[in-house]
Curated annotation (Swiss-Prot):
It is an enzyme of class 1 (oxidoreductase). GO terms for biological process: alkanesulfonate catabolic process; antibiotic biosynthetic process. Disulfide bonds: none annotated. Its EC number is 1.14.14.13. Belongs to the bacterial luciferase oxidoreductase family. Monooxygenase component of a two-component system involved in the biosynthesis of the side chain of the aminoglycoside antibiotics in the biosynthetic pathway of butirosin. Together with BtrV, mediates hydroxylation of gamma-L-Glu-GABA-S-BtrI. Not able to hydroxylate free substrates, activation by the acyl-carrier protein is mandatory. Octanoyl-S-[BtrI acyl-carrier protein] is also accepted as substrate. Pathway: Antibiotic biosynthesis; butirosin biosynthesis. This is 4-(gamma-L-glutamylamino)butanoyl-[BtrI acyl-carrier protein] monooxygenase BtrO. It catalyses: 4-(gamma-L-glutamylamino)butanoyl-[BtrI ACP] + FMNH2 + O2 = 4-(gamma-L-glutamylamino)-(2S)-2-hydroxybutanoyl-[BtrI ACP] + FMN + H2O + H(+). It comes from Niallia circulans (Bacillus circulans). Gene3D superfamilies: Luciferase-like domain. The lineage of its organism: Bacteria, Bacillati, Bacillota, Bacilli, Bacillales.
């Protein structure tokens, strides 16, 4: 596992369905990655679902147009067997001399799993994911033939060349730790366990205390809206994610979701829209996004982030950082953080 002295920030690349056409999508994907490089963001999460382009293909274009940007690629086991994923990692690191990080997912949308004939129950999906990561690590780390026999994957004396040229190019593996099975698997197999955090006390009780003492790092996925004044920030937040009836209906449905993080966020949103004057569930309540938002002036948001860092958070996956203005405002927040990149 890895040890970090500084906080690692990742942005995200929106799906192609957010844009009017190929040209607009690619121009914006590259622009976001280049802004990430310019403003000290490690890399960007590229999503996987049935409505977006393949994240490996998108990342290959982005890497050609950036110098340091590290893709954080959502990896769904039914899409790529571990051998294929390992070969892609090997090829990307060889061609670009750059790391590829992985966000291991099991799938929060039951319908997509059923469509591919890959549906298995929640607990079994994490058992399969654990095996997947074991095989992936064996392939990337072993300098001799690899054999493995599990319930889902089998390798027989497999030769896998060439080796990654430098240990610094080994992928950092992120995994959701919102459910009990996810957290248990992440603590055994990942470098980072990720959650959509609750407000500080909730996060401490339900997540950070369970991770403390392990070699695995904590990561959170959150959006930030910060401005010179809290009044400005809240005005922007409400304009970006206005209340609507459909969102409220969907919110109650999410309390019955198979996804534990969807249920948790829905329950928090139903209990209160705002916590600690900064932690806002309005974007999730209204169906606009799938994460909480920190809203306030630069000092308020920086202070709240610092409290997460005191609870052991070492990586932040930032939502909706799509323009240079977004990066500038986040840079102002970072100025008030006690352990900046």
């Amino acid at each position: 596992m890895i040890a970090l002295d500084t906080i690692q920030y990742y942005g995200q690349i929106p799906g192609v369905n957010h844009y009017n056409g190929k040209k607009e999508f690619m121009e914006n994907a590259v622009k976001i990655a280049q802004l990430s490089d310019a403003y000290g963001i490690v890399g960007s999460l590229s999503f996987f679902n049935h409505s977006v382009l393949d994240p490996w293909a998108v990342s290959s274009v982005i890497m050609r147009h950036t110098e340091r940007h590290v893709p954080l690629i959502a990896l769904q086991p039914y899409m790529y067997p571990p051998y294929t994923a390992a070969k892609l990692i090997q090829s990307f690191t060889y061609l670009y001399d750059r790391r590829i990080d992985l966000n291991m997912i099991t799938g929060a949308v039951t319908g997509e799993l059923q469509q591919t004939g890959g549906y298995i129950d929640h607990s079994s999906r994490y058992k399969k994911l654990h095996e997947y990561v074991q095989v992936l690590r064996l392939l990337l780390e072993s300098d001799s033939a690899v054999s493995f026999k599990g319930d889902y994957y089998e390798l027989n004396n497999l030769e896998f060349k060439p080796l990654l040229p430098d240990k610094r190019l080994f992928p950092r593996i992120f995994m959701s730790g919102s459910s009990e099975e996810g957290l248990e698997t992440g603590l055994k197999a990942a470098d980072f366990v990720v959650t959509h955090p609750g407000p500080l006390e909730h996060f401490k009780r339900h997540f950070s205390e369970k991770v403390q003492g392990s070699a695995v790092q904590s990561a959170i996925r959150i959006e930030i809206i910060a401005r010179e004044s809290a009044e400005q920030a809240w005005k922007i937040a409400h304009a970006r994610y206005p209340g609507n009836r459909q969102g409220k209906i969907q919110l109650r449905m999410k309390t019955n979701s198979e996804s534990s993080w969807q249920r948790m966020l829905a329950e928090l949103a139903l209990a209160s829209e705002t916590y600690d004057e900064v932690f806002w569930m309005g974007g999730y309540m209204n169906g606009g996004i799938y994460s909480p938002v920190l809203v306030g002036d630069y000092e308020q948001v920086a202070a709240y982030l610092n409290e997460y860092y005191k609870l052991g958070v070492k990586a932040v996956l930032l939502g909706s950082m799509y323009s240079e203005e977004d990066f500038i405002h986040f840079s102002r927040v970072k100025e008030g953080i006690s352990n900046p990149v």
